[in-house]
């Protein structure tokens, strides 16, 4: 990967582990010698609301914020969140999304319907889309809560110049010991 500034958005809903994913990603990128800026926007995260984290890296990064049309990647823990943040993706950018559906409050209260054909809408907008049931893979690893690490494993496939061992070591450095075995398995299963 070149040393120009790259932008990754990690999006999901509260409780899905987006913040841990951003910490792991930041650690991995710093281990590769990049200047890394991470900015977290929580919204109503404790109530299942939208959560977004910006991760920017390169030789020198001056701002932690990603503007509309600048994201190289959107790592989405829930497909509606990928659609919600689509305008931030640059032309030809890559979306990696879990196909899981988490109903937002307006759907729960009956004020709106969950949108149909989200993956098709993302593709029609020109995004490259890698959509998969990452939740089932997390369950195979041992816990649905590991979906964040499964998605990190998938993201690692797009960064071939970063050795897998660096991603794996990030778990040892950041995740509490009692959860490490599960997370190592989830990371490995998430890879292509």
Predicted regions and their residues:
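Active-site cofactor/cluster-binding pocket
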Residues: 1-192
């Amino acid at each position: 990967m070149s040393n120009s500034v790259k932008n990754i958005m990690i999006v999901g809903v509260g409780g899905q582990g987006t913040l841990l994913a951003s910490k792991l990603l930041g650690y991995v990128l710093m281990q590769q010698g990049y200047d890394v800026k991470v900015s977290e926007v929580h919204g109503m995260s404790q109530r299942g609301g939208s959560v977004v984290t910006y991760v920017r890296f390169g030789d020198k990064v001056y701002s932690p914020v990603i503007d509309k049309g600048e994201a190289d990647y959107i790592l989405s823990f829930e497909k509606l969140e990928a659609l919600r943040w689509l305008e931030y993706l640059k032309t030809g950018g890559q979306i990696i999304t879990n196909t899981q559906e988490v109903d937002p409050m307006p759907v729960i209260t009956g004020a709106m319907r969950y949108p149909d054909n989200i993956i098709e809408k993302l593709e029609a907008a020109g995004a490259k889309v890698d959509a998969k049931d990452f939740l089932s893979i997390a369950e195979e690893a041992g816990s649905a809560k590991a979906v964040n690490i499964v998605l990190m494993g998938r993201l690692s496939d797009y960064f071939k110049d970063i050795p897998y061992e660096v991603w794996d070591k990030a778990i040892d450095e950041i995740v509490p010991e009692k959860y490490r075995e599960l997370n190592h398995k989830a990371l490995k299963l998430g890879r292509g």
